[in-house]
Swiss-Prot record:
2-oxoglutarate-dependent dioxygenase; part of the gene cluster that mediates the biosynthesis of imizoquins A to D, tripeptide-derived alkaloids that serve a protective role against oxidative stress that are essential for normal germination. ImqB is a canonical three-module NRPS that assembles the tripeptide backbone of the imizoquins via condensation of Trp, Tyr, and Leu-derived precursors. N-methylation by imqF and phenol oxidation by imqC, followed by cyclization via the FAD-dependent oxidase imqH carry out the three-step transformation of L-tyrosine into tetrahydroisoquinoline. GO terms for biological process: small molecule biosynthetic process. Belongs to the iron/ascorbate-dependent oxidoreductase family. The keyword S-adenosyl-L-methionine does not apply. GO terms for molecular function: metal ion binding; oxidoreductase activity. Induction: Expression is down-regulated by ralstonins, lipopeptides produced by the plant pathogenic bacteria Ralstonia solanacearum. Expression is positively regulated by the imizoquins cluster-specific transcription regulator imqK. Fe cation binds at residues 227, 229, 287. Binds 1 Fe(2+) ion per subunit. This is 2-oxoglutarate-dependent dioxygenase imqE.
Amino acid sequence: MTMLSDLPKIPTLDWADFAEGDTDQRLKLAQGLVQGFKRFGFVKLVNHGLSDELIQQLFAEVKRFYRLPDELKQKAAHPPGPNPQRGWSGIGVESTSKLYGEQTERPSGKLKDAKVGTDFSSSKLSRELTHMKEHYDIGPPTDTQFPTRWPDEQDIPGWRAFMESYYARGQSFCLDLMEALEIGLELPKNTLRSMCIPDGSELRLLHYPEIPAAELRTGDTARIWPHTDFGLITLLFQDGVGGLEVEDPLQQGHYIEVAREQPYEMIVNVSATFERWMNGVIKAAVHRVNITPEGKHVEDAVVPERWSAAYFFKAHKMAHAGPLPAFVTPERPALYDNITALEFQKRRTDLVYTGQQLKVEEAA
């Protein structure tokens, strides 16, 4: 049985120390970033340079899309399969419980993804069940192999232009973050950055409909099951509803709440490709979206809808996703196979959509 631990606390770092500081301040921030990633796989950043107004508009635009009728969103639907996700995936399409079983060794066949009904006034929960989360994925504007599936401009004017602009801001920030990690890890300049150009990242816009808390208390349902992200790092902005938790690497099964302490703080977590680069020296953060603290104690509570925006920063598609030479030694041989970033993503995406592990030779 998992437990939520109030302590220790995810560290908060001031990004201005790196962006505007002297050599010593930049080094201290870079070292703090590495230390936070090694301990938790998570850090929070303030003064990150993305304005409050930009984040406000981001959430307004996310909500504007999800308020569209399903028939308009369906025009931009992502076709299930192992390819990188592009466009809208409706409730029930993606299932992180398949990743949950893979990563925790708990049989995934015993799990159900979070379900939502339509009549919360009813005391009965025996209604049609569907998966809880819907999301929309945006890829690189220059990606002609896997282009983003956009809604019609006439249905939501100006939306594509804003999202492409925000995507570019996220990519630029993440490249700076790679520079900081190179300093903190004592790697030669451009060791990490060079494998991220051209970009292969994705911007994901998430909406979690409201759900009766009773469905989340059973232990068989969750908004998102424990999982790790696919790429290098994830930048996350979330609303104040709560529920995001990260597993304490030092206490398996114990989860730390990642509550929003400041309205526009940025949450940054380590993802699976970065763990592979580091040969496991820095591990990807296992995290989930669980019942909110308030929902745990009120019998008939309804957990409100939740909004978030995640920038999945990734290596370019043909970059190697195996361990970097600096982290492979006779005492610590390579722990991961040296496939490309695209092959690794297809392997993971196929598992999410079909529950089947894609073989390396099938991923190309």
